[in-house]
């Protein structure tokens, strides 16, 4: 026997639907884990694949992983899951792709080498709009 179709609306998968609110939560989670040199770049007008980059650093592999865990946990609380995660096990550069924003958590040397802030220099730095 087939289940009866429901006419009730389903709950949205994402409860934090406002991108800036999600970025603000990610910033707070990173700050809670003592992320250093945190920057938020607004890429909406210079990129067609995401609206914001959150870039920050940790001083060790463990701290980079702890920051990534904290951001993911905070997003899970809002029923938001990353589309893709890269680099967690190595702890040098962890990328958390949430679609409309991407979190980059580096150790110092890879951050200097890849220099995303310089690469995306046309994007406004809006960090102060997201600090708690």
Question: What is each of the regions a protein language model found here?
Answer:
Residues 1-40, 44-45, 59-66, 73, ...:
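Long, contiguous binding/interaction regions
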Residues 39-49, 83-100:
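Glycine/charge-rich, flexible interdomain linkers and switch-proximal surface loops
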């Amino acid at each position: 026997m087939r289940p009866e179709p429901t006419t009730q609306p389903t709950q949205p998968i994402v409860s934090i639907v406002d991108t800036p609110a999600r970025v603000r939560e990610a910033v707070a989670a990173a700050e809670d884990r003592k992320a250093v040199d945190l920057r938020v770049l607004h890429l909406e007008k210079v990129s067609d694949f995401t609206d914001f980059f959150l870039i920050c650093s940790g001083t060790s592999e463990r701290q980079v992983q702890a920051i990534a865990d904290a951001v993911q946990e905070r997003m899970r609380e809002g029923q938001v899951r990353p589309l893709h995660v890269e680099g967690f096990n190595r702890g040098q550069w962890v990328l958390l792709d949430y679609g409309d924003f991407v979190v980059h958590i580096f150790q110092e040397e890879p951050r200097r080498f890849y220099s995303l802030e310089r690469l995306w220099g046309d994007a406004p730095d809006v960090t102060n709009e997201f600090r708690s």
